[in-house]
């Protein structure tokens, strides 16, 4: 037994700060993992959230997944990480941490009577979960200056920016 434990992120300043520090140190994270998106989703869209963490025996954060509960007549009840964006899946220091976050997400889905869970990652997970490639993302590396960026676009596109 490794001593890892899953819990729900609270609202204290210390917990939120630890979450954001973990996100900023992770190469797997996107800006959408930052805790500020929790407030945006709850306050602007009215969707409840459940941000899960994995902590070691010493209490240090070693994994997380931001989950949002969505319910609609058309799509049913489900948890997604994260809605409205293509990134926001699990981040963990170990495969065991990922497994614990998956188990925590499944438990939350049961509590909320959710029909499925969507975890949005850039790369496929090493899991038995069903995977889909219906989402498409496009990225553009940013050059050193705004002027260099504009030079890379055709003139018609530049006039629309």
Residue ranges and their predicted role:
Residues 1-161:
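N-acyltransferase acceptor-side catalytic subdomain
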């Amino acid at each position: 037994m490794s001593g890892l434990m899953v819990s729900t992120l609270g609202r204290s300043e210390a917990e939120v700060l630890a979450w954001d520090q973990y996100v900023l140190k992770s190469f797997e994270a996107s800006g959408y993992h930052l805790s500020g998106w929790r407030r945006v989703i709850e306050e602007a869209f009215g969707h409840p959230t459940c941000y899960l963490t994995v902590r070691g025996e010493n209490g240090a954060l070693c994994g997380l997944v931001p989950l949002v509960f969505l319910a609609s007549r058309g799509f049913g009840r489900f948890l997604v990480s994260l809605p409205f964006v293509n990134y926001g899946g699990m981040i963990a220091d170990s495969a065991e941490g990922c497994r614990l976050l998956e188990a925590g997400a499944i438990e939350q889905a049961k509590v909320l009577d959710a029909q499925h869970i969507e975890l949005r990652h850039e790369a496929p997970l090493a899991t038995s979960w069903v995977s889909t490639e219906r989402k498409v993302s496009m990225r553009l590396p940013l050059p050193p200056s705004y002027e260099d960026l504009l030079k890379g676009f055709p003139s018609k596109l530049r006039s629309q920016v």
